[in-house]
Amino acid sequence: MPKGKNPRVTVILECTSCVRNGADKKKESPGISRYITQKNRHNTPGRLELKKFCPYCYKHTIHGEIKK
């Protein structure tokens, strides 16, 4: 059995609405919500986006993959 790179990689998901609100002078949220998860590189070659709960926005928002 050939051994190569592991297709599963660890990725960090960051709330997209917190990032937008944090850029303004009036900061509505005290922080940025981040989740750590894994994705299969073969099945999902592009950026991963999941709808997760953001404790700073108090609602479900889209969390996008960020680079390390």
Curated annotation (Swiss-Prot):
InterPro entries for the chain: Ribosomal_bL33, Ribosomal_bL33_CS, Ribosomal_bL33_sf, Ribosomal_zn-bd
Keywords: Chloroplast, Plastid, Ribonucleoprotein, Ribosomal protein
Keyword Ribonucleoprotein among record annotations: yes
Main localization (coarse): plastid
GO cellular component, one term: chloroplast
Entry's localization field: Plastid, Chloroplast
Any single biological process term in GO: translation
Protein name: Large ribosomal subunit protein bL33c
Annotated organism of origin: Nymphaea alba
